[in-house]
Curated annotation (Swiss-Prot):
Protein name in UniProt: 4-hydroxy-2-oxovalerate aldolase
Keyword Metal-binding assigned: yes
Keywords: Aromatic hydrocarbons catabolism, Lyase, Manganese, Metal-binding
Site (Transition state stabilizer): 12
EC number per UniProt: 4.1.3.39
Family: Belongs to the 4-hydroxy-2-oxovalerate aldolase family.
Matches recorded under InterPro entries: 2-IPM_HCS-like, 4OH_2_O-val_aldolase, Aldolase_TIM, DmpG_comm, DRE_TIM_HOA, PYR_CT
Domain called Pyruvate carboxyltransferase: residue spans: 4-254
Catalytic activity: (S)-4-hydroxy-2-oxopentanoate = acetaldehyde + pyruvate
NCBIfam families hit by this protein: 4OH_2_O_val_ald (TIGR03217), PRK08195.1 (NF006049)
Length: 338
């Protein structure tokens, strides 16, 4: 195993868990702590990327562009990244984000739809950005298929392509097989992004590293969608124990998690029964809080909603299905004889 590059996504994936309420001061504090601890890339946007602030995905307390500007002004060494989902973020938002200081663009598509990212990669490269491809919900397709999609992203200009376990549904051998397939197919770097819905965020990341992953992601205190992500401070400790620490200050990251992030967290992401259901059913991790809220409003078990969403193979961008499924379950309850 080689020392990987770590991207911290507390200020993007963690936005889901905080209902997109990060403040300017919180961004400054988190970026400063990560930067001083040696984290090389820090991702900052709404949980659903540039222009994600909306009725569909939830409104941000502070506009993304303002948070990006705060991050760039605060970071002394780290590069600032942003996420963009084609169909949500547009050229206008990308240009504005670059003006505010974005240096790395991570372009995310469903793992079956890499072809919709071509113009976004080309525009980002024309603007001089480092580009990373994200194949979301990678558990839904076999390794060979993912490799074909990754080759498309490479041909469009991706400097790295990630296997993304959006549902936290993979087991270690799943993560390893997909990373191996991409390593065999690509000439660019390969990354892995984990979620912890089955309690395997760290384990799957290690399996990905053993399979040759060049880049990995983490969030301080595991703050992220569903049961959270692989915890940055834990990853740092594990990498150090393995002798492949890429320059991270392990103790400083522990302190950042404990004293900077933990006090602002409304809850500790954990594989509780609903989050486990996300991983078990293979559902997009961001659906968790929506399913809980709607389930409480309508008197429906969130797990029933999530399992049905998994059966229908819903993906990111189909949050409106959550209410539809819940209402259908209510109707079924009302027509079932007691």
């Amino acid at each position: 195993m080689n020392a990987p590059r770590l991207t911290d996504t507390t200020l993007r994936d963690g936005s889901h868990a905080l209902a997109h309420t990060f403040t300017r001061q919180q961004v400054r504090d988190i970026v400063r702590a990560l930067d001083r601890a040696g984290v090389p890339v820090i991702e900052v946007t709404h949980g659903d990327g540039l222009a994600g602030s909306s009725l569909q995905y939830g409104f941000s307390r502070v506009p993304d562009l303002d948070l990006i500007a705060e991050a760039r002004e605060t970071a002394e060494r780290a590069r600032i990244a942003a996420l963009l989902l084609p169909g949500i973020g547009t050229r206008r938002e990308l240009r504005a984000a670059v003006e505010r200081g974005v240096q790395v663009l991570r372009i995310a598509t469903q793992c079956t739809e890499a072809d919709i990212s071509e113009e976004h990669f080309k525009m980002a490269k024309d603007m001089g950005l480092e580009t990373v491809g994200f194949l979301m919900m990678s558990h839904m397709r076999p390794p060979e298929f993912l490799a074909e999609q990754a080759r498309l992203m490479e041909s469009y200009g991706a400097d790295c392509v990630y296997v993304v376990d959006s549902a936290g549904a993979m087991l270690p051998h799943d993560a390893a097989a997909r990373v191996q397939a991409l390593k065999a197919a690509l000439t660019v770097q390969v990354g892995f992004h984990a979620h912890n819905n089955l309690g395997l965020g760290i384990g799957n990341t290690l399996a990905a590293l053993e399979a040759g992953a060049d880049q990995i992601d983490g969030c301080l205190r595991g703050l992220g969608a569903g049961a959270g992500n692989a915890a940055t401070e834990v990853l740092a400790a594990v990498l150090d124990r393995l002798g492949i620490n890429p320059g991270l200050d392990v103790l400083a990251l522990m302190d950042a998690a404990e004293y900077v992030v933990a006090p602002i967290m409304p809850f500790q992401p954990f594989p509780d029964r609903d989050a486990i259901t996300i991983g078990y059913a293979g559902v997009y991790s961001t659906f968790l809080l929506h399913a809980r809220r709607i389930g409480e409003q309508l008197g429906v078990d969130p797990r029933a909603i999530l399992i049905e969403l998994g059966r229908r193979q819903t993906v990111a961008g189909q949050e409106d299905w959550i209410l539809d499924v819940a209402l259908e379950l209510v109707r079924q309850q009302q027509t079932t004889p007691v």
